[in-house]
């Protein structure tokens, strides 16, 4: 795991560190934001890695530039998250007591060009 402050530059730096470590040889990186994943794609390419042939990269957010980068992403529907959070706050402000509970939120896996099966697992 690397810390990358949710920016393209942070994702780039962290991926350079990760891929520069001779003790690890990942076939995939799951990144905590699309911005960082874009930086990871750029770093991998600068190091001569082919995305996705040598390294699959997936982000989270559904960023509008994801299609340009060919980035596989998990889209989270922030409008729905915000609406549900606002409703919970309004109920609390009205004095309504709500027990703690889990809320299942929708998401969508958007598969693009940054992911594939690892080479050693492809049929011969």
Label each PLM-derived region with a short phrase:
Residues 1-9, 69:
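Short beta-strand elements in bilobed, periplasmic/extracellular small-molecule ligand-binding domains
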Residues 14, 20-124:
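Flexible loop/turn connectors
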């Amino acid at each position: 795991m690397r810390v990358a402050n949710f920016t393209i530059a942070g994702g780039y730096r962290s991926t350079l560190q990760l891929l520069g470590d001779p003790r690890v040889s990942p076939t995939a990186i799951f990144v905590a934001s699309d911005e960082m994943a874009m930086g990871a794609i750029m770093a991998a390419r600068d190091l001569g890695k082919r995305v996705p042939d040598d390294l699959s990269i997936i982000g989270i957010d559904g960023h509008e530039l994801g299609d340009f980068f060919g980035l596989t992403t998990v889209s989270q529907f922030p409008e729905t998250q915000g609406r549900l959070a606002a409703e919970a706050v309004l109920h609390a402000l009205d004095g309504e007591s709500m027990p703690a509970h889990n809320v299942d939120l929708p998401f969508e896996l958007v598969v693009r060009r940054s992911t594939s099966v690892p080479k050693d697992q492809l049929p011969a």
